[in-house]
Amino acid sequence: MSKNWFPLLCASVLVVYVSIASSSTGTASGAVTPTSPTENTTGPLIENTTLRTHEVFKINMSKFPYRVCSMAQGTDLLRFEQNINCDSFKPTKEDFEEGIMVVYKRDIRPYTFKVHMYQKILTFRQSYSFIRENHLLGFSQEHLAVPMWEVHYINKLNRCYNSVVRNVAGATYVNYHRDSYVNETMLLVEDDFSNTHSSRFVTVKELWHKPGSTWLYTTSCNVNCMVTVTTARSKYPYDFFVTSDGKVVDISPFYNGSNNKHFGENRDKFSVRKNYSMIAYYGRDNAPEVAHPLVGFFERPDVLMSWDIVEEANNTCEYTFWEQSERTIRSEADDTYHYTSSSMTATFLTSKEELNESDPSFQCIKDKANEQLQLIFNTSYNETYVQSGNVSMYETTGGLIVFWLPVKEKSILEMEELAVAYNNTNSSTRRKRSTDSASDSNKTSEEVLKSIVYAQLQYTYDTLRNYINRALRQIAEAWCKDQKRTLEVFKELSKINPSAMLSAIYDKPIAARFVGDVISLAKCVEVDQNSVKVLRDMRTKESGVCYSRPVVLYTFKNSSHVQYGQLGEYNEILLGRHRTEACEYPSLKIYIAGNSSYEYVDYLYKRMIPLDSISTVDTMISLDIDPLENTDFKALELYSEDELRSSNVFDLEDIMREFNTYKQRMIHVEGKVFDKVPGYLRGLDDMMSGLGSAGKALGVAIGAVGGAVASFVEGVVGFIKNPFGSFTVILFLLAVLGVIYLIYMRQKRAYEKPFEHFFPYVVPPTTVKEAPPSYEQSQYENIKEKAASATKEFSLEEAYQMLLALQKLDQEKRRKAEADDEDFASNGQSAGFLDRLRNRRRGGYQKIQNEYEV
């Protein structure tokens, strides 16, 4: 019992001594740095220890847990690599293949062929002949198509008739050249105005005109027969063609009357002749004849055209040769092939799906492309290379056609054959290609671009990618060499502290020690993380001796026994408390545990410092590289072809189509205008014709009368519409109104003053103006007038005698006036028109004779 109490007594004395020493030290150091309130308090005892809670503090845990890594012998053995082999750097997974490439582009040039145009040009000249000079007033021209029978005559004899017969509105009109009224043939000669793409042959080079008689107008007629051999062009898909003078024909040049080619004109005006013979050239007599297998004729009101009809497949080709590349590298990406040519400085992208060689559009270029590939191979590769495959066709994203012939060196092929023989396998060496084509490569021929800028851009990108990947390969190789050198450094440092080096390398806590030339590894034993506590005081019981690292209290898992150790690096707990040093004053030490650091001043804990507030020494040089992956550039089109066409206000094709349509419409309207027979007369004539001969005769009579009446009415209407006629009618109406006004005034005057009107020769009495009488005199005169107002009444006989006397008097006065007029007229002294007009109301007016005339 006494043996048990003695150790307890010694432990109690030690605890009291440590408490007193810590209190005195805390008081001494408090003069420099303030301490926390818990340092001056007495806490409860820690279980299974003689320490109290105020003498320790808890620490946190971060990446590495608190563990004990001291061991006697490890279970795993490791060694450092002696030689490190650096593998070759391959940025992307690409398979390269060498070959020959021939590129064809879409032929945008139109199909060109010859067209013969037959026309008769009527020129009407009008002139006026004066006394000494003739004046040309102008001319007009009219283009007419040569009849079909006359076209055959021209193609046989190189001659054309000088007359034109037309039927307009049921009437026949005939025009002769030079108004000769003789129908004869004329020789076709070459015109002086032919050019490189057109040749014209005419019958008249100079126009003729004969002036008329003096003060007369004259109109002359010239009939010129013209045959034009010109070129026409038709663009894919060959639905119409355009002649060099701008005439648009909405017919496919390959339409033969029975195939499915486009035809948009009047079918009644189109005909086809097989084995048609015609002269080889115009302008000469006795020209040789040439047979044409199939000739098409199309007639318009102003021209008749003919051209040779041929097969489209034998005379047109949708593609034409563009470029060839003798040295081409093909690389395979996920969905596409890249054809890179350094001579063309371009890279072309195609899908992995091959084109169908039996397509009719490729028949015209397939044989030529194969011959060209074989020629290049025989001249450049035949000695050292062999063909490693057949010719294949691909379409690029820009609409180009690529013919590809893969080649391979003979030495490489021999090595492959040896490898195949060694492995005793019959597997094909041909690489399996994906049949899934890229969605962007399925373009129709109407959507492709007409530019290859995208190919040059793709080549630029691939070139840069190769340069960058080469640089990355060099960096990777240099990095590998640096790792070899770093390994040697780690191996030498591991001899000093193997556990620290191995923990840093494997990024986890490891216990390591050298056992000869190898390293023995053991797993660290983790302790109860919540039981880890650090003493605040780093001083020992011996004077002048302090711990070199803080003392730690901990317990193992599933154990309550408290162990003592010292805090190592990265939360490692070092077994034992034998790591001491001589105390140094003043002293400042900071120890890292978890995510925090703990500051000890003069070997006493002062405060906790956040780890983020302490700067780190960054020796890491990061290397973050990624290889450039494949990127397929797409051929972008800012505006489509239709948008570019519609953005221009002038569209030549539409303008010419509209112009030709307008011309045909005007000719049709002209025929309707000249048809002057009214519809009702046509209906009446049809009705009368159905009644037999009598009805037809009656209809002719009615039509003649109706035509005469209609002609008279049209003449009157035409006269009124004429400016001179309208002015004449207005003057006539004014004259009629004037006559009516004079008659009205005469009748009014006769009604108001009949005596003066019927007896103008009776002179009325002269009125004498006197002063008015006085009142008495006026009364007297009134009495006298009343007395004399009683008049005598006359009988009917007397009235009759008076009328006879008046008649006799009137006759005498009129005879006397006529006699006087005759006398004055004989003497040259008649009254003028103005005098008679001025004195028309005064009957019997005569000019007074002077004394000399008497």
From Swiss-Prot:
Membrane topology: Single-pass type I membrane protein
Chain intervals for the UniProt region annotation (Hydrophobic membrane proximal region): 669-721, 700-720
Subcellular location: Virion membrane; Host cell membrane; Host endosome membrane; Host Golgi apparatus membrane
Alphabetized Gene3D superfamilies for the sequence: 1.20.5.1890, 2.30.29.100, 2.30.30.1230, 6.10.250.3280
Annotated signal peptide: 1-30
Chain positions carrying an annotated carbohydrate: 40, 48, 60, 183, 256, 275, 314, 356, 378, 382, 390, 423, 426, 442, 558, 595
Pfam family for this entry, one: Glycoprotein_B
Assigned GO CC terms: host cell endosome membrane; host cell Golgi membrane; host cell plasma membrane; membrane; viral envelope; virion membrane
Disulfide bonds listed in the record: C69-C524, C86-C480, C160-C225, C317-C364, C546-C583
Virion surface side: 31-723
Keywords tagged on the record: Disulfide bond, Glycoprotein, Host cell membrane, Host endosome, Host Golgi apparatus, Host membrane, Host-virus interaction, Membrane, Signal, Transmembrane, Transmembrane helix, Viral attachment to host cell, Viral envelope protein, Virion, Virus entry into host cell
Subunit comment: Homotrimer; disulfide-linked. Binds to heparan sulfate proteoglycans. Interacts with gH/gL heterodimer.
Family: Belongs to the herpesviridae glycoprotein B family.
Name listed for the protein in its UniProt record: Envelope glycoprotein B
Organism: Rhesus cytomegalovirus (strain 68-1) (RhCMV)
Lineage: Viruses, Duplodnaviria, Heunggongvirae, Peploviricota, Herviviricetes
Gene: gB
